[in-house]
Design a protein with these regions (language model features):
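C-terminal motif of bacterial Sec signal peptides marking the signal peptidase cleavage site
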Residues: 17-20
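A structural "domain/chain start" motif
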Residues: 22-89, 199-204
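Envelope-exposed proteins and targeting segments
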Residues: 47-54, 63-65, 72, 80, ...
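Short secondary-structure boundary motifs at beta->alpha junctions and helix caps
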Residues: 75-83, 153-195
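Bacterial N-terminal signal peptides that target proteins for export
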Residues: 1-10
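Extracytoplasmic/secreted envelope proteins and their assembly/folding machinery
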Residues: 89, 93-97, 103, 183-186, ...
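Surface-exposed short loop/turn segments
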Residues: 22-44, 103-155
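Sec-exported extracytoplasmic/periplasmic mature domains
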Residues: 97, 101-105, 131, 194-202
Length: 204
């Protein structure tokens, strides 16, 4: 993905050089994207418990707005010209909260930022959020999230946790395709999360 974008940047740089010493050169235009997962289906049975979305933490390499591209096993690059509208953490937090409401897993869903007056607290850690260009012939979008469910009134250790991972193959190398793939992967993960939470039958 970066190589494709880098070519465009190189052309722009050459054009700017040929333009001479123009005082009024246009500033680079950034393209911004949202994470917009599809709606989650409702589960068959709703738990009588309430749940609050706690903290959504994104791993350091991916927590900024700019898109991240993995070019090698140990080399990540940021794409200055393509970014999320806001940082990934609040985008993903909003998506999780919406999915919990849509799925009807719990009788009540308390949004993040409110006091922990709920039966359960759900935290999330995003361990991967990047475009994988290690194999240019098969570029992909990687997303990994681990969820932790705890009871604020009891032990600190989570009563349940599970890691989810999705890799979407990109049909074309573009920022728009990458953003759409991550939105679809996030929706898929949230759908599976809702079904898993419904199957747990957490006791009061």
């Amino acid at each position: 993905m970066t190589r494709h974008f880098a070519s465009a940047f190189l052309v722009a740089a050459v054009a700017a050089t040929l333009a001479g010493c123009s005082i009024t050169r246009p500033s680079p235009v950034k393209q911004m994207y949202l994470l917009e997962p599809p709606a989650v289906a409702a589960v068959a049975q709703t738990s009588p418990l309430s749940a609050r979305l706690g903290t959504v933490t994104v791993a350091a390499p991916y927590r900024e707005r700019t898109f991240v591209v993995r070019e090698a096993d140990l080399r990540f690059e940021t794409d200055f010209y393509h970014e999320y509208v806001v940082a990934p953490a609040p985008l993903i937090a909003e998506a999780i909260a919406s999915a919990l409401v849509q799925s009807n897993v719990f009788a009540r869903v308390i949004p993040p930022g409110t006091p922990p007056e709920a039966d359960l607290t759900i935290d999330a850690f995003v361990g991967a959020l990047y475009a994988d260009n290690r194999d240019p012939k098969a570029p992909g979008a990687e997303l990994a999230i681990t969820f932790y469910v705890s009871r604020p009134d009891r032990a600190v250790a989570p009563v349940w946790s599970k890691a989810y991972h999705r890799r979407a193959t990109l049909s074309t190398v573009s920022a728009a395709t990458y953003a759409a793939a991550q939105s679809a992967s996030l929706g898929d993960i949230l759908g599976e999360l809702s079904r898993d939470l419904a199957a747990q039958r957490f006791a009061r």
